[in-house]
UniProtKB/Swiss-Prot annotation:
CDD domains: Arl3 (cd04155). One of its GO terms (cellular component) is nucleoplasm. GTP binds at residues 24-31, 67-71, 126-129. Belongs to the small GTPase superfamily. Arf family. Small GTP-binding protein which cycles between an inactive GDP-bound and an active GTP-bound form, and the rate of cycling is regulated by guanine nucleotide exchange factors (GEF) and GTPase-activating proteins (GAP). Required for normal cytokinesis and cilia signaling. Required for targeting proteins to the ciliary membrane by releasing myristoylated protein from unc119 cargo adapters into the cilium. The lineage of its organism: Eukaryota, Metazoa, Chordata, Craniata, Vertebrata. It is found in: Golgi apparatus membrane; Cytoplasm, Cytoskeleton, Spindle; Nucleus; Cytoplasm, Cytoskeleton, Microtubule organizing center, Centrosome. One of its GO terms (biological process) is protein localization to ciliary membrane. It is a peripheral membrane protein. One of its GO terms (molecular function) is GTP binding. This is ADP-ribosylation factor-like protein 3. Keywords: Cell cycle, Cell division, Cell projection, Cytoplasm, Cytoskeleton, Golgi apparatus, GTP-binding, Lipoprotein, Membrane, Myristate, Nucleotide-binding, Nucleus, Protein transport, Transport. It comes from Taeniopygia guttata.
Length: 182
């Protein structure tokens, strides 16, 4: 097989593009998670004022990840990004217990959005490397995740800093893309 036929074969089987929306409160670790996925330097991260987009190849998919800032003043603009979302990844700071109620409210509002109806959701219980982090099971219970019936969902413990648990979550994403794709 010559080089040209190899290139033609590669071109004929392009990766399926997947639009992923990465949301969560400010300081939850969304950008760190995104940079970890893209194998980029995570030593200097500042709060996201608008949004970041990165494309990551994984298991035959081209994952186009939209990381939107989580500050309170930016959250009303989240809805501008809902259209054509294949997977929602919601990041929670597992160590910031004071904000569990706030993050739960934001997640509940997202799950009620018509444009996100039926979209599979992965909840990353981030910052598990911190001693004060609540386990994913406790967060799932506190946010009543077991009541979600209109979509597939998963909660995944992770540390965006160390990368632990991140790949497990992305494996789930790749497995569940097809449940939303028509």
């Amino acid at each position: 097989m010559g080089l040209l036929s190899i290139l033609r074969k590669l071109k004929s089987t392009p990766d399926q593009e997947v639009r992923i929306l990465l949301l969560g409160l400010d300081n939850a670790g969304k950008t760190t998670l995104l940079k970890q996925l893209a194998s980029e330097d995570i030593s200097h991260i500042t709060p996201t004022q608008g949004f970041n987009i990165k494309s990551v190849q994984s298991q035959g998919f081209k994952l186009n990840v939209w990381d939107i800032g989580g500050q309170r003043k930016i959250r009303p603009y989240w809805r501008n990004y809902f259209e054509n979302t294949d997977i929602l990844i919601y990041v929670i700071d597992s160590a910031d217990r004071k904000r569990f109620e706030e993050t739960g409210q934001e997640l509940a509002e997202l799950l009620d959005e018509e444009k996100l109806s039926g979209v599979p959701v992965l909840i990353f219980a981030n910052k598990q490397d911190l001693l004060t982090a609540a386990p994913a099971s406790e967060i799932a219970e506190g946010l009543n995740l077991h009541t979600i019936r209109d979509r597939v969902w998963q909660i995944q413990s992770c540390s965006a800093l160390s990368g632990e648990g991140v790949q497990d979550g992305m494996n789930w994403v790749c497995k569940n893309v097809s449940t939303k794709k028509k």
